[in-house]
C-alpha cells in the first residue's frame, strides 16, 4: 500500500492572513490532485477563509474537534452540522492534546465519532501511547484499549472504511523525535490486525496515518513502509515549504519512486 493522505493539523495557530498565505502556497505548489489527498485542519476561526481559497480545488479541510450534540445550550462548542456548513469533509477526534489537556475519555471520543458520522463527516481518530506507557511495555495494551472503543463503529456493510486512524505516539508529538519508520510500521501492523478482527476487507482498506514530528526530511522513509498510508503533520504544516515537501514525498512514494 502507498500513502494516500497528507494532513496538516494547524492546532491553535494562525490568523486570517496566515490561513490565506498557507492555503495559497499549497494550492500553487503544483501538487498532483488527490495523489495524495491533501487535507488541512485549521482552527475553527479560519475554516471560512480556507474554504474560500480552496473551494474549487482538490484540497480538503476539516475541523480539529466537534461536540456530539447537534445544537443547543453548549457555550463554546461546535457541532458536526456546523463543520459541514463550512465545507468540512473531515474532523480530527481524540487528539492526544484533547485527551490530555481537556481530559477527553474513550467514551466521549466514541460519542464524538458517532456524531461526526451522523453529520456526514469522516472522523480521523487519533490514538497513541505516552513515553511512560511505551517504557513500561504498554504500547499494545494502550492502543488496544483506545481502539476497542473505536473499531466497533466501523460500518461493516460498507465497502470502504467510514473512518481513518492516525497513530500519534505522544512522545513524538512536537518533540522533533519521530518514531522510526520501523517502529511506526510495527504499530500500524498491530492496528490493522485489531481492525481485521472486525472485517479483514475493511482492515486492508483502512487508512492509517502516522503523526509525530513528521518533517520534509523524514517523510519519505516513513512513507516507504507498507502500512503507513500517509501523515498527520503538526508543526511542519505551518511552514508551507516543509508541508509541500512532505506532500511531494508522498507523491513520489505513490509512484514507487
Ligand atoms: O500532533 C501532531 C499532529 O496532529 C503532530 O505534531 P508535530 O508534527 O508537531 O509533532
UniProtKB/Swiss-Prot annotation:
Q: What is its EC number?
A: 5.3.1.1
Catalysis: reaction(s): D-glyceraldehyde 3-phosphate = dihydroxyacetone phosphate
Primary enzyme class: isomerase
Question: Per the record's keyword annotation, is Isomerase included, yes or no?
Answer: yes
Q: Which GO molecular function annotations are given, in alphabetical order?
A: triose-phosphate isomerase activity
Q: Where does substrate bind?
A: 9-11, 174, 213, 234-235
Pfam families under this entry?
TIM
- What pathway annotation does it carry? Carbohydrate biosynthesis; gluconeogenesis; Carbohydrate degradation; glycolysis; D-glyceraldehyde 3-phosphate from glycerone phosphate: step 1/1
Q: Which GO terms describe its cellular component?
A: cytosol
Record keywords: Cytoplasm, Gluconeogenesis, Glycolysis, Isomerase
Task: Report the subcellular localization.
Answer: Cytoplasm
Q: Which domain of life is it from?
A: Bacteria
Active-site residues from the entry: 95 (electrophile), 168 (proton acceptor)
The record's Gene3D superfamilies line, in alphabetical order, gives: Aldolase class I
What biological-process GO terms show up in the record?
A: gluconeogenesis; glyceraldehyde-3-phosphate biosynthetic process; glycerol catabolic process; glycolytic process
Q: How does it assemble?
A: Homodimer.
The UniProt family comment states: Belongs to the triosephosphate isomerase family.
**Protein task:** Involved in the gluconeogenesis. Catalyzes stereospecifically the conversion of dihydroxyacetone phosphate (DHAP) to D-glyceraldehyde-3-phosphate (G3P).
Q: What is this protein called?
A: Triosephosphate isomerase
Q: Which organism is it from?
A: Acidithiobacillus ferrooxidans (strain ATCC 23270 / DSM 14882 / CIP 104768 / NCIMB 8455)
